[in-house]
């Protein structure tokens, strides 16, 4: 059986886009969502600041990620959990307990995203030799930054424009 090695161009850009978008959802979009839903600034600051904890403690649980299963398994599983978490946020908004429910889902997103970061970086290190790692470090960083820009700027702008259009139509 042949050992087929896929081109890093086939997976590095999308892997690092997928790494950046959930981070933006947890750290930026959660704050905007809670502000638009009428949560007080004090509560927003207190509860959303705790959402950063999974990224802070990544070094403590990364050895467990290295021991259990493969990096690819962790990447795929975390991407599925992130997708479910993003859908979960949408389902929690119309509830009467949206703040508590969405905060729990944002916690799931934060831990899934931080675990995805560990697995993605580990997969990158295993799949590429040192020369390829040196070549792709800028590409990986660029696509992560594109995800940050798209999540913070583009998505927020589009949603704000969409919201304003609906408010204008409602006032007619």
Predicted segments, located by residue:
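C-terminal ends and interior cores of transmembrane alpha-helices
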Residues: 80-96
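Glycine-rich segments within core transmembrane alpha-helices of 12-TM secondary carriers
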Residues: 138-152
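Small-residue (Gly/Pro/Ala) motifs that create kinks and tight helix-helix packing interfaces
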Residues: 151-159
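Conserved small/polar residues in nucleotide/adenosyl-binding loops
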Residues: 161-170
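Central cavity-lining transmembrane alpha-helices of secondary-active solute carriers
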Residues: 46-63
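Hydrophobic core of transmembrane alpha-helices in multi-pass small-molecule transporters
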Residues: 98-116
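Helix-loop boundary and gating motifs at the non-cytosolic
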Residues: 4-51
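Cytoplasmic membrane-interface "Motif A"-like loop-to-helix N-cap segments
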Residues: 67-79
């Amino acid at each position: 059986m042949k050992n087929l090695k896929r081109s890093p161009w086939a997976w590095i850009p999308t892997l690092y886009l997928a790494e950046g978008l959930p981070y933006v959802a947890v750290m930026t979009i959660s704050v905007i969502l809670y502000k638009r839903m009428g949560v007080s600034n004090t509560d927003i600051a207190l509860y959303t600041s705790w959402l950063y904890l999974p990224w802070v403690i990544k070094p403590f649980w990364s050895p467990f990620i290295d021991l259990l299963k493969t990096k690819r398994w962790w990447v795929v599983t975390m991407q599925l959990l992130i997708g479910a978490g993003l859908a979960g946020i949408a389902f929690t908004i119309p509830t009467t307990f949206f703040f508590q429910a969405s905060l729990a889902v944002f916690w799931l997103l934060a831990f899934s995203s931080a675990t995805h970061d560990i697995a993605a970086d580990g997969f990158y290190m295993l799949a590429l030799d040192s020369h390829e790692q040196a070549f792709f470090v800028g590409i990986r960083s660029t696509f992560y930054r594109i995800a940050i820009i798209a999540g913070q700027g583009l998505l927020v702008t589009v949603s704000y424009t969409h919201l304003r259009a609906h408010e204008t139509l409602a006032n007619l």
